[in-house]
A protein has these predicted regions:
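C-terminal transmembrane helical hairpin of 12-TM major facilitator-type secondary transporters
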Residues: 13, 18-30, 34-99, 103, ...
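Helix-loop junctions at the membrane-solvent interface of multi-pass transporters
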Residues: 59-67, 84, 134, 151, ...
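Residue-level signal for discrete positions within transmembrane alpha-helices
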Residues: 27, 31, 116-117, 121, ...
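Short amphipathic helix-loop junctions that connect adjacent transmembrane helices
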Residues: 1-16
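Transmembrane helix-loop junctions in multipass membrane proteins, especially transporters and channels
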Residues: 69-73, 132, 136, 160-167
Length: 170
């Protein structure tokens, strides 16, 4: 986020703290979002909340990050994205327990994390390839947001196999 801020806001002194402020704000709101996610999961269900987080994160990347070109909008994007889109690790064990039960939960959670590790390892590199190939952070936002939306859609089959009612707390 600091590199993006430096590119989008060349008027900021790169040796000052200013380009890092969006990262600091986003990390602060990530903590708030993870705590908040527990309350949301209690109210609406962990699987529904996990879907919402992924979906909101994808939409924020596609609609907001792709157009965040001012210092204020970059800070706002970072804050909103982490507040709403960063619930994965907080909700993963809770959602896994809802889907598979608590027996062997540590193993199940480990397999889920291992299953998403290729994306974690390759995601930043692929974003770099997109950035190098296009020279546009907007294209990176489209790529990243699209993958996050696709990830949110991958949650739906498991959710609806467990409970078909749309408004069910699951």
């Amino acid at each position: 986020m600091t590199a993006y801020t430096t590119v989008q806001c060349p008027e900021l002194d790169p040796d000052s703290l200013a380009p890092s402020i969006p990262l600091i704000v986003s990390n602060f709101t990530l903590g708030i979002g993870r705590v908040f996610s527990g309350f949301i999961a209690d109210a609406f269900g962990p699987i529904n909340s996990l879907f919402f987080s992924f979906f909101a994160g994808g939409i924020l990347q596609l609609a907001f990050w792709s157009n965040a070109t001012t210092y204020g909008s970059i800070i706002a994007f970072g804050a909103l994205y982490q507040l709403l889109g960063g619930w994965f690790f907080a909700l993963l064990p809770y959602a896994a327990a809802q889907l598979f039960g608590t027996r062997g939960l540590a193993t199940i959670t480990g397999y889920i994390i291992a299953g998403q590790s290729p994306g974690q390892f390759a995601g930043a590199s692929l974003s770099g390839v997109v950035l190098d190939g296009t020279g546009s952070y907007q294209k990176v936002a489209y790529y990243s947001g699209s993958l996050m939306l696709a990830g949110s859609l991958c949650i739906l089959p498991a959710r609806f196999l467990r409970e078909k009612r749309i408004l069910a707390r699951l």
